[in-house]
A protein has these predicted regions:
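Cys-nucleophile CN-hydrolase/nitrilase-fold catalytic domain and related Cys-dependent amidase chemistry
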Residues: 18, 27-109, 115, 181-184
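Residue-level detector of alpha-helical recognition elements and their boundaries
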Residues: 22, 36, 40, 124-125, ...
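Short, acidic/polar
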Residues: 20-29, 158-166
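Extreme N-terminal starter segment of soluble prokaryotic enzymes
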Residues: 2-7
């Protein structure tokens, strides 16, 4: 099956600290690559706990610049080593006080391709996301990766008709053998 794409999706339990979460995901990526995965996507805010059940400014410490932060750089090297496309949902700081729930997309050669910022930010009891994140401002990009066109959603955006329509409208229309994958 020449057109078969093997994808890995990872959702893990919180280990208690950022570094051990990153190591856990590095190990999982290596394991997925050994099993033939060509692309891997981690869970929302992958290196931290899902902290949005409370409103506490201490969690701003989990923010990183994308693409210039240490986690993006670290996984660029890993993507290149494993020859694997990676989707890394992280807590992004654009500037002090401006934060996003963002997924960085890294190609199989380690190239940073861009990012998707979560568009739909819930704000109900137990999901105080607007305390932490601004709505994304970069649209619904499609990334041309080594495995094909990839669109990225984070959490509630997958239920948005507008997001799906925008991703579909930018997808290739030819009978090309290139694949298109939307990761939610």
């Amino acid at each position: 099956m020449a057109n078969m794409l093997k994808a890995a999706l990872l959702q893990t339990d919180w280990t208690g600290d950022k570094e051990s979460m990153i190591v856990k995901h590095e190990e999982a990526a290596r394991d997925a690559a050994a099993q033939g995965a060509q692309i891997i996507c981690f869970q929302e805010l992958f290196y931290g706990p899902y902290f949005c059940q409370v409103q506490d400014a201490e969690y701003y410490e989990y923010t990183e610049y994308i693409p210039d932060g240490p986690t993006t750089k670290r996984f660029q090297a890993l993507a290149k080593e494993l020859n694997m496309v990676m989707v890394l949902p992280m807590y992004e700081i654009e500037q002090p006080g401006v934060y996003y729930n963002t997924a960085a997309v890294i190609d199989a050669d380690g190239t940073y391709l861009g990012k998707y910022r979560k568009q739909h930010i819930p704000q109900v009891k137990g999901f105080w996301e607007k305390f932490y994140f601004k709505p994304g401002n970069g649209g619904y990009p499609i990334f041309d990766t080594a495995v094909g066109k990839v669109g990225v959603y984070i959490c509630t955006t997958v239920t948005s008709r507008r997001g799906g329509e925008r991703s579909a409208s930018t997808a290739p229309r030819s009978s090309s053998t290139r694949q298109r994958l939307t990761v939610a």
